[in-house]
């Protein structure tokens, strides 16, 4: 009986829940300062993120911490989640990327929805943008906007007002 209890304790010692205190994103591998559920502080824990994805969570987010070989001196954070900001109501199979400001990209069953939360959306470092579809625009369309260009509306007014 004692052997089973010992094994149980050892297995439970391999994984833990924690609360994020701070994150340092200055190095190649992000590090996280956490407080384990029992109040045990751990500083500089490596956060192993999936290739191609990175995020810097807010203080108060939750983390899952692994202790390889049960060695509590060398922990790794394998996931960080923040239920305060998680999008709700996704349908089965839908996927979203989101932040604490309400910005999101959601792959829905009807199509892709980009929500800029009232902020500018900027596309960078591309020679052109190509849209192989009809465009429906509810706001103004302006060309050469950084050098005093003109709007489509202004061009229409000039064209419609032209007489021969």
List the predicted regions and their residue ranges.
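Low-complexity, small-hydrophobic/phenylalanine-enriched stretches
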Residues: 60, 105-107, 112-152
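Hydrophobic alpha-helical segments used as single-pass signal-anchor/transmembrane membrane anchors
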Residues: 159-163
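Exposed beta-strand/loop interface patches that mediate assembly or binding
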Residues: 1-109
């Amino acid at each position: 009986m004692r052997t089973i209890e010992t094994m149980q304790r050892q297995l439970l010692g391999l994984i833990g829940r924690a609360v994020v205190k701070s994150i340092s994103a200055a190095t190649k591998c992000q590090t996280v300062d956490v407080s384990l559920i029992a109040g045990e502080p751990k500083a500089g824990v490596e956060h192993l993120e999936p290739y191609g994805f990175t995020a810097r969570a807010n203080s108060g987010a939750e983390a899952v911490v692994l202790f390889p070989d049960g060695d509590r001196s060398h922990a790794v954070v394998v996931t960080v989640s923040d239920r305060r900001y998680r999008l709700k109501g996704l349908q089965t199979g839908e996927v979203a990327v989101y932040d604490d400001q309400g910005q999101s990209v959601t792959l829905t069953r009807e199509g892709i929805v980009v929500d800029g939360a009232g902020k500018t959306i900027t596309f960078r470092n591309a020679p052109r943008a190509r849209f192989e579809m009809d465009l429906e625009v509810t706001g103004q369309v302006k060309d050469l906007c950084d050098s005093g260009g003109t709007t489509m509306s202004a061009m229409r007014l000039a064209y419609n007002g032209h007489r021969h």
